[in-house]
Amino acid sequence: MRNNPVLPVSDPPLAGENDSDGKGVDDRLFKGSAMTKRGAYAALSYMACAVMLVLFNKAALSSYDFPCVNVITLFQMVSSSLFLYALRRRKIISFTAADSFSIDSASTFVPVKTLFHTLPLAIAYLLYMLASMASVRGVNVPMYTTLRRTTVAFTMVIEYMLTGQRYTRSIIGSVGIILLGAFFAGARDLSFDFYGYGVVFLANISTAVYLATIARTGKSSGLNSFGLMWSNGIICGPILMIWTFICGDLEKTINFPHLLTPGFMVVLLCSCVLAFVLNYCIFLNTTLNSALTQTICGNMKDLFTVGLGWMLFGGLPFDLMNVIGQLFGFFGSGLYAYYKIIGR
């Protein structure tokens, strides 16, 4: 094996494998194990990348008035696949836990049989992506924030159904505070829209299924974080390409007046790079910690996103109930992080 620099990956634990403290992986599934230093770095990296990505996407969609969200997602997905291809060809990364970098053919990066095995994850990812985009249009912003915060509850239920994962009372209590904060944040705007509610809850369910499926698919397929990202791109990329063509988004993109301006290209490039890093952090965070931890991190980064977005882009009306709800949500997320660090 050549002496190549290898990027850190999250390899799926093998059945019966022991970790560094001598305990089997399965023995810790139902306990409030403390977050490792590597897991903490993964969580912090995700939050930093997520905030930056939202700001760059906001710049592309608002500052430049780019009309096609799906095309940005397609660019990000294609860019991620190209990054993975280049890194794998140069043998800087591997796609499996036991990869010895002996495979030189791009066509055999991930066997077709393994791709079919990861199909449920890819479908969950595509549904999560499309439902999340549609949900923004279905309800107003306060209600959207309120309903999306309930994803933590969906994640706990889905994790229990798929993996039997259970949590301590401390963790459940912190999640309850987050849900209370979500209610306060949208309490002034509880207008009922059946279609809008349905789309947002579909986005919540698909998000929970996607996050819970990451660790499960990684363990059963033998793929690490990069391998799962590659499989997602190979399966979802062509589907999203066809979808954007049918919707007419590709034609709108070609006719976009700022498409080749340096400023827009820099914003789009940064968005694609950050999306690649963010997807890697999501896989790493979900595998090293849990799907629920990933969801909680998403709630914590909302506060920084709202603050930076208000300072850079403005347009955020002040509402005391919304502020109280945001603080409740941040407090609950902080409690969750504290309990994970001390192992309760």
UniProtKB/Swiss-Prot annotation:
Coiled coil: none annotated. It is found in: Golgi apparatus membrane. Disruption phenotype: No visible phenotype under normal growth conditions, but mutant plants have increased levels of high mannose N-glycans, decreased levels of complex N-glycans, and are insensitive to root growth inhibition by salt stress. The keyword Ion transport does not apply. Expressed in roots, leaves, stems, flowers and siliques. Belongs to the TPT transporter family. UGnT (TC 2.A.7.15) subfamily. This is UDP-N-acetylglucosamine transporter UGNT1.
